[in-house]
Amino acid sequence: MNQTLLSSFGTPFERVENALAALREGRGVMVLDDEDRENEGDMIFPAETMTVEQMALTIRHGSGIVCLCITEDRRKQLDLPMMVENNTSAYGTGFTVTIEAAEGVTTGVSAADRITTVRAAIADGAKPSDLNRPGHVFPLRAQAGGVLTRGGHTEATIDLMTLAGFKPAGVLCELTNDDGTMARAPECIEFANKHNMALVTIEDLVAYRQAHERKAS
């Protein structure tokens, strides 16, 4: 990732710390991956605190595929089958079947309905019957080990939520341009600045976690 482009957001470690602070303050974070991977920016929010307004922003400026990143334990708790048995997608993204809250929603499409679905899925005592399938929220199962195992937005979301002190569950959506093309780093940076979001790269998060785990050992 071009560090000159990112310099206004601080050093790699500062970017991670600023992202954690933003999440704790109820703000969103823009997460970029490498140019040689998806080369995309995802808006992420804590599943516990994301507001209807933030969901509306995400739907308006994102791909429309609003994803809920969860752990394997949560997937099992909710009895969510993986979307396919044989995942042949380029990066092995861990989609499960889609979901809708069983109660408290209308069509499930609105920002408010999607927030209701997210909250139902992450509730402490959530059970399979709390969700209908299919729906308009796309759960993503993160790999154990986070970004140190798989350098994806799903794992980055779970790692950031955990480091920020939230449940390991977060909402993500890819940022798109007004013409429908995918937003790249310059557009993601502009969007983050405009909407008071922190910005961090998956590479930053990998280095941060490796450094902290070396200290711990």
Curated annotation (Swiss-Prot):
Domain of life: Bacteria
Result when mutating E40S: Loss of activity
Compartments where located: Cell membrane
Site residues, Essential for catalytic activity: H136, E174
Enzyme Commission code: 4.1.99.12
SUPFAM superfamilies for the chain: YrdC/RibB (SSF55821)
Binding site for Mg(2+) 2: E38, H153
MF-aspect GO terms: 3,4-dihydroxy-2-butanone-4-phosphate synthase activity; identical protein binding; magnesium ion binding; manganese ion binding; protein homodimerization activity
Consequence when changing R37E: Loss of activity
Effect of substituting R150S: Loss of activity
Pfam families xrefs: DHBP_synthase (PF00926)
Task of the protein: Catalyzes the conversion of D-ribulose 5-phosphate to formate and 3,4-dihydroxy-2-butanone 4-phosphate.
Similarity annotation: Belongs to the DHBP synthase family.
NCBIfam families the UniProt entry points to: ribB (TIGR00506)
Protein name: 3,4-dihydroxy-2-butanone 4-phosphate synthase
